[in-house]
């Protein structure tokens, strides 16, 4: 068994204020680090800010400051928020530290020496006005997939990953002029050459038991599709300079330098850093990330280390989490939607309450919506009504009727057998980084304690059988001590407070669990928490919901919206041509049951060959406002399903319906007896707010099935049974 835990949380970008969803990784890693220390494992928890790259450079332009000044300001903001949340880093550093440049350049030179670096020419936007190549976020335009405004790396509206040259009507963000396409030269890491070593490492690291399901699926899909050489340089000023002739004016891509930041930040506090990072036999590297960062930690960072041919500590356990969202809305600081780290501090609600709720709902296997009403309910019922109630009622009752002194108890099986089994279960959940399950197991133990107190009715027996009643209460007091230890990774301030009740006579250590050690007196007691009041929660909900118009717009009932505003129809694909100005765009001529038919433009070339689609019946948004894509008119949008691993499939009607009829409308099952009007034209934004999903192979809006208007057959998604539909 490895003796040391080296724990990292994904380095947050330092160009914004973190919201609740951004805090999941640092909080998760903090809980695991505290558990690790509790188990007397040598532990180092490393994190810091990711400061280089386009996001920082463009944010500095917008705020009319320098990247250095921007990073200094946001680093201080991040640090203060994490301190308020009581996150116990061993170091919270920065990728602009002195050792980072040397560490990144040194690894690059080793990769080059070992033959893993190539160079290639590529086409990139160049701004003639500003005389510079434009990295992805320096370009804005229309998304070729949904027509919305998008940056050159990804469309925030439909989540489509993009390259800048995919954008329609591209513009430079600095001068707003139209850039030209120009050839530039970049360095690449040769991932195909490292593939065999990468796969061998994955097999020996037992990733199937040490990584969660989403990480395994995402990584295996990436490897199955074939590794490609990946650019590691960019035409920017704010970054680590490339130590190679002819590339002096370029910097390393932030995805290349950021993971190396874990190493360089460790160097800042430990001369003995190699005992952590070059000690694969004794050190277990545990990394906490969001699902959007999986491949950088399972493929890219390991490939960099393997390619250097040095004895690096490799990834052991990977804990990737899903997204924490806000009241079915998008977090937006400018619109006042959602609660951000600096807002949390001003609510008057303690850090441990926030920590408890985030762990209780940690998005381990699926996304989670933060809801104010649920927040109040869980805190009042679980943290206060269950855990805090046990601590308060037992200690105050004992102190009142039996005094301050705590006697040593005899550990009896009838009281402790079930509880000790639950201790083992809790510690195993911690070990497997199933933090939500660990917390809920602790709350189950607390419930057992409350039930024992209630069932035994010590208020009735204290006079008739005082010795037996005292023994019962003493067992419950030792149970409370154990709960304060087990729950300390989640709510450390509260755990310390309980320890102070007992004069801090024991440590946060697993060696005390289930024993009669470490308790002498109850020095004082007080209520741990007060209940959250509805008036406070309602005021916070209103405060962080955005302006009224925006709130009404974003929370419009999806069912009413679909019934009144959306018209989906079955169409047959008659012909497909490629757009001469954009090879990825198909021009589809459709039979929609009308004499003239329809034409739509869709970016399907990466997913389908023309012959696979011609003659098939698909579903389109029939009443979408017309748009032009690279000069070609589009009169609608086909709908497709995408799963969490970005697998994408067009919904083919033949998969579930014989002899489809072009022009037949798709409606909600609840509207099957209604006479529906044809709605007016709508924007893509309005359509996406209907939130159509595939659930167990069936298309639904808010749980209601979509069906064919005449045959009443359900609309199915055979190839991707669960995912979002757009």
Curated annotation (Swiss-Prot):
GO cellular component, one term: cytosol
Residue window of motif 'HIGH' region: 12-22
Residues the record lists as binding Zn(2+): 143, 146, 155, 158
Domain named tRNA-binding: residues: 562-667
Xref: Gene3D superfamilies: HUPs, Isoleucyl-tRNA Synthetase, Domain 1, Methionyl-tRNA synthetase, Zn-domain, Nucleic acid-binding proteins
Residues reported to bind ATP: 333
Main location: cytoplasm
Keyword Lipid metabolism: no
Keyword field: Aminoacyl-tRNA synthetase, ATP-binding, Cytoplasm, Ligase, Metal-binding, Nucleotide-binding, Protein biosynthesis, RNA-binding, tRNA-binding, Zinc
Task of the protein: Is required not only for elongation of protein synthesis but also for the initiation of all mRNA translation through initiator tRNA(fMet) aminoacylation.
Protein name according to UniProt: Methionine--tRNA ligase
Organism, scientific name: Borrelia turicatae (strain 91E135)
């Amino acid at each position: 068994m490895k003796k040391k835990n080296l724990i990292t949380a994904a380095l947050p970008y330092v160009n914004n204020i973190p919201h609740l969803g951004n805090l999941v990784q640092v909080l998760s890693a903090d809980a695991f680090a505290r558990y690790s220390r509790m188990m007397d494992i040598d532990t180092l928890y490393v994190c810091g800010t990711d400061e280089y790259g386009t996001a920082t450079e463009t944010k500095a332009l917008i705020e009319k400051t320098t990247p250095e000044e921007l990073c200094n300001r946001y680093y201080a903001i991040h640090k203060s928020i994490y301190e308020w949340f009581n996150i116990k880093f061993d170091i919270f550093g920065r990728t602009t530290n002195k050792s980072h440049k040397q560490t990144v350049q040194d690894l690059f030179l080793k990769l080059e020496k070992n033959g893993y670096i190539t160079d290639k020419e590529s086409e990139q936007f160049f701004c003639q006005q500003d005389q510079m190549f434009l990295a992805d976020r320096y370009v804005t335009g229309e998304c070729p997939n949904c027509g919305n405004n998008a940056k050159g790396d990804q469309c925030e509206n439909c989540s489509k990953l993009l390259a800048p040259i995919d954008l329609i009507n591209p513009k430079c963000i600095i001068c707003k002029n139209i850039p030209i396409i120009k050839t530039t030269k970049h360095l690449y890491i040769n991932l195909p050459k490292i593939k065999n070593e990468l796969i061998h490492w994955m097999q020996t690291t037992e990733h199937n038991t040490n990584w969660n399901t989403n990480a395994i699926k995402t990584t295996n899909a990436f490897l199955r599709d074939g590794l490609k050489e990946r650019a590691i340089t960019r035409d920017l000023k704010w970054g680590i300079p490339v130590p190679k002739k002819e590339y002096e004016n370029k910097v390393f891509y932030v995805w290349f330098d950021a993971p190396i930041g874990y190493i360089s930040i460790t160097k800042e506090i430990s001369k003995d850093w190699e005992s952590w990072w070059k000690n694969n036999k004794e050190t277990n590297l545990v990394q906490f990330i969001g699902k959007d960062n999986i491949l950088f930690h399972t493929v890219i960072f390991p490939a960099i280390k393997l390619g250097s041919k040095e004895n690096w500590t490799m990834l052991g356990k990977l804990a990737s989490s899903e997204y924490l969202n806000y009241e079915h809305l998008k977090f937006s600081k400018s619109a006042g939607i959602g609660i951000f780290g600096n807002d949390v501090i001003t609510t008057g609600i303690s850090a441990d309450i926030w920590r408890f709720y985030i762990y209780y709902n940690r998005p381990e296997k699926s996304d989670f919506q933060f809801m104010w009403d649920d927040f109040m309910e869980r805190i009042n019922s679980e943290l206060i009504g269950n855990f805090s109630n046990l601590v308060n009622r037992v200690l105050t009752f004992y102190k009142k009727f039996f005094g301050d002194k705590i006697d040593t108890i005899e550990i009896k099986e009838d009281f402790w057998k079930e509880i000790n089994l639950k201790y083992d279960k809790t510690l195993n959940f911690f070990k497997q980084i199933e933090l939500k399950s660990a917390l809920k197991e602790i709350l189950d133990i607390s419930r057992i304690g409350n039930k024992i107190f209630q069932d035994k009715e010590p208020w009735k027996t204290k006079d008739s059988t005082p010795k037996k009643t005292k023994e019962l209460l003493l067992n419950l007091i030792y149970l409370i001590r154990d709960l304060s230890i087990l729950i300390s990774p989640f709510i450390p301030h509260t755990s310390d407070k309980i320890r102070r009740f007992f004069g801090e006579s024991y440590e946060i250590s697993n060696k005390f669990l289930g024993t009669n050690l470490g308790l002498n007196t109850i020095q004082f007691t007080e209520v741990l928490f007060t209940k959250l009041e509805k008036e406070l929660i309602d005021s916070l909900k209103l405060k962080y919901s955005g302006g009224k118009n925006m709130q009404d717009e974003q929370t419009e009932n999806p069912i009413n919206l679909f019934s009144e505003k959306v018209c989906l129809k079955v169409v047959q694909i008659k012909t497909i041509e490629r757009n001469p100005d954009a090879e990825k765009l198909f021009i589809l001529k459709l039979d929609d049951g009308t004499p003239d038919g329809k034409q739509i433009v869709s970016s399907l070339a990466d997913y389908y060959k023309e012959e696979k689609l011609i003659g098939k019946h698909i579903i389109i948004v029939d009443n979408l406002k017309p748009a032009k894509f690279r000069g070609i008119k589009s009169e609608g949008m086909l709908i497709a399903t995408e799963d969490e691993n970005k697998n994408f499939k067009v919904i083919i009607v033949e998969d579930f319906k014989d002899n489809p009829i072009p022009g037949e409308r798709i409606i909600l099952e609840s509207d099957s007896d209604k006479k529906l009007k044809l709605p007016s034209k709508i924007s893509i934004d309005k359509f996406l707010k209907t939130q159509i999903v595939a659930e167990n192979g069936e298309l639904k809006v808010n749980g209601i099935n979509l069906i064919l208007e005449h045959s009443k057959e359900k609309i199915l998604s055979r190839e991707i049974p669960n995912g979002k539909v757009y």
